[in-house]
């Protein structure tokens, strides 16, 4: 799916709730096509040369380095914009974006994070990803809302990472919604296109942990 489709679906919803919506293109796609190779192509190359394990290792390495660096650069840029409240920056993502959300909340001072289906498609075959995401939530600096549709590829990420947050005494929400669409891939796109179901829950969470400053 093209990032623009996700931006078109999600942007108006966040704006309606009073948020600035910032959706950067990842390397190799859209407006960032010349910024570096596309992560999907790099994973495919690694799989061809070294199998599933090599592909998983490449995925984790890129998401935890180059792509995380890009996320943190975007966070730093946002904090310096006059139209942004620097202490009210939240991070949210679906699929790879959910993985990035988890990695980002360990490093940046977000007020809250929303992880939809992060790592679901790769979870069972990528113990490296499980370890990296688990390690990140252990050090999470902000509350996280984990959610998935019941028919997503694997519900392990939400259940496992929520359990880690609970064990660490960190604030979180865990939610498994009813099946979305007819296939597992439909379920995996719930974070993009299922806002009619999750909208109230997500923005109640954001309002709780990222309250607007009271006018003086």
Which stretches of residues belong to each language-model region?
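Short amphipathic alpha-helix adjacent to the substrate-entry channel of hydrolases
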Residues: 3-24
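Gly/Ala-rich beta-loop-alpha elbow adjacent to hydrolase catalytic centers
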Residues: 93-97, 101
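The feature captures the conserved acid-bearing segment of alpha/beta-hydrolase catalytic domains
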Residues: 112-176
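Alpha/beta-hydrolase active-site loop
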Residues: 39-82
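Short beta-to-alpha linker loops that shape the active-site pocket of alpha/beta-hydrolase fold enzymes
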Residues: 20, 25-30, 118-119, 178-180
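C-terminal catalytic histidine-bearing segment of alpha/beta-hydrolase fold enzymes
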Residues: 171-216
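Glycine-rich "HGGG/HGxG" loop immediately N-terminal to the catalytic nucleophile
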Residues: 28-41, 183
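Alpha/beta-hydrolase fold nucleophile elbow
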Residues: 83-94
């Amino acid at each position: 799916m093209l990032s623009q489709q996700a931006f078109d679906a999600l942007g108006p919803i966040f704006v309606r709730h009073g948020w600035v919506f910032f959706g950067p293109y990842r390397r190799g796609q859209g407006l960032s096509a010349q910024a570096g190779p596309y992560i999907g192509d790099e994973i495919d190359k690694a799989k061809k040369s070294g199998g599933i394990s090599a592909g998983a290792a490449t995925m984790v390495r890129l998401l935890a380095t180059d792509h995380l660096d890009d996320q943190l650069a975007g966070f730093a840029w946002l904090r310096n914009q006059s139209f942004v409240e620097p202490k009210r920056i939240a991070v949210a993502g679906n699929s790879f974006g959910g993985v990035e959300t988890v990695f980002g909340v360990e490093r940046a001072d977000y007020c809250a994070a929303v992880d939809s289906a992060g790592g679901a498609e790769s979870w069972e075959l990528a113990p490296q990803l499980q370890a990296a995401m688990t390690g990140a939530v252990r050090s999470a600096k902000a509350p996280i809302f984990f959610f998935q549709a019941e028919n997503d590829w694997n519900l392990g990420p939400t259940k496992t990472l929520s359990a880690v947050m609970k064990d660490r005494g960190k604030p979180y929400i865990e939610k498994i919604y009813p099946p979305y669409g007819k296939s597992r891939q439909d379920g995996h796109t719930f974070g993009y296109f299922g806002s009619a179901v999750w909208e109230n829950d997500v923005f109640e969470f954001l309002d709780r942990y990222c309250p607007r400053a009271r006018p003086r």
